[in-house]
Amino acid sequence: MSDGEQAKSRRRRGRRRGRRAAATAENHMDAQPAGDATPTPATAKRSRSRSPRRGSTRMRTVHETSAGGLVIDGIDGPRDAQVAALIGRVDRRGRLLWSLPKGHIELGETAEQTAIREVAEETGIRGSVLAALGRIDYWFVTDGRRVHKTVHHYLMRFLGGELSDEDLEVAEVAWVPIRELPSRLAYADERRLAEVADELIDKLQSDGPAALPPLPPSSPRRRPQTHSRARHADDSAPGQHNGPGPGP
């Protein structure tokens, strides 16, 4: 056999060995235990190509706005005699959760007007707005929607009326000593608002109404909004920003 024929024979044998090695590698790759080895990019790609496509449905996000108030009786008198109106709702775990009265801003209302109306509807008493306490933002999911809720809260002066729990959404209403608010309010965000109210009442009593910060501008609502409710039964940690919040 000539030198040229020997070289061709070696090249053919090399190609056959290469094909056998490649086939052996593929067989080892396909025989990997599914639970013991991390898929290689090749196997992961094949798995993805065989899996059915999932629907591209996205959860709709809605934005809702509410308003409420912390109504103080005796706001000009001794601090130890001051009381605040709270509402109680029973969740599906049977817990009575105390919070501030509040509700959705209706068409044509400002946030302050809503706070006055909702306080009257949920507690039976009348109040006037003195100052803004702040706002609370939180998210929750209900009826296949992600709801971003913003609630505006106000410090309010008690004007008159009798406590009443005729609102079907409210289990109890009560006058609570203002010093007990940190232990009574179920939600951390509302407890922080009570601290702000305490500071504002000190300013009101020491320097008069002129010492209170001016109310932020509030325009009447021009479009109706959805009315969703957070489910307290799922609220294992009241006051969280990302999760069920304090009611309507």
Curated annotation (Swiss-Prot):
Induction: A possible member of the dormancy regulon. Induced in response to reduced oxygen tension (hypoxia). It is hoped that this regulon will give insight into the latent, or dormant phase of infection. Its EC number is 3.6.1.-. Gene3D superfamilies: Nucleoside Triphosphate Pyrophosphohydrolase. Mg(2+) binds at G103, E118, E121, E122. Disruption phenotype: None observed. CDD domains: NUDIX_Ap6A_hydrolase (cd03673). Residues 1-64, 204-248 are annotated as: Disordered. Its cofactor is Mg(2+); Mn(2+). GO terms for molecular function: hydrolase activity; metal ion binding. Signal peptide: none annotated. Residues 31-44 have a biased composition (Low complexity). A motif (Nudix box) lies at residues 103-124. It is an enzyme of class 3 (hydrolase). The keyword Metal-binding applies. Residues 9-20, 45-57, 220-230 have a biased composition (Basic residues). Belongs to the Nudix hydrolase family. May be involved in the GO system responsible for removing an oxidatively damaged form of guanine (7,8-dihydro-8-oxoguanine, 8-oxo-dGTP) from DNA and the nucleotide pool. In vitro has dATPase rather than 8-oxo-dGTPase activity. There are 4 mutT paralogs in M.tuberculosis; the exact function of each is unknown. This is Putative mutator protein MutT4. The gene is mutT4.
